[in-house]
């Protein structure tokens, strides 16, 4: 409103314009003084201006998906002492909001007869890294057709240990995600949990799990609670990345997924981990047991 008054004041005068807009002329002059002499503004107003810049930075650095709680927690991690209600107030003024998750579309094709038993029973907890992995995949619509994105997640801290983007739902694509996870972690005795999708209960996949010393586990088909953690990651990925724009092709989705996985593992704050990123939580665990190599 003030820029409009600035533009019209020479033609119509401040008094008549303020009268028409139902504001006091003193309000206009006060705003003018604050704009031209920012150092004379109240301490709260000056701090708000500084906080807005910090809030915008945190929001931008985290893919513009953080809501009030995550922005507030990140500011606290950086040593910026601010009340949550202040962050909420300023984000509302700035028009910033977090991204909400959508619903998962079923992609599972069942092969119940050859599936392994359920070793997890919906207890998605782990006392250490590489004790329990969960796997699932989702789909992404692009201009050139559907592509599919598979994730393997370590339950202890939610670290994504393997992922792959493919133009088909063939078993080889989830096998590629598994190979990446095996190469990165070198696990032994890890429980690998998935749904009863045909890719995960295929002979090739189950044989590779056995060769690597992993213990296969499957939940019931069509029940999201039996693979809740993996489906939660899929939902987060779709909400924070995929649903925010249209995608041209597989390569574009692959690059965006690479960027997101790096952010998720190394910078995204998880409340259950004391508002720390997964990578940091794993390092803290290894430091606590004296494993300096993995804690570094």
UniProtKB/Swiss-Prot annotation:
Keywords: DNA recombination, DNA-binding, Transposable element, Transposition. The keyword Secreted does not apply. InterPro entries: HTH-like_dom, Integrase_cat-core, RNaseH-like_sf, RNaseH_sf, Transpos_IS3, Transposase_IS3/IS150/IS904. Signal peptide: none annotated. GO terms for biological process: DNA integration; DNA recombination; transposition. Residues 125-285 form the Integrase catalytic domain. The keyword DNA-binding applies. SUPFAM superfamilies: Ribonuclease H-like. GO terms for molecular function: DNA binding. Involved in the transposition of the insertion sequence. This is Transposase for insertion sequence element IS629.
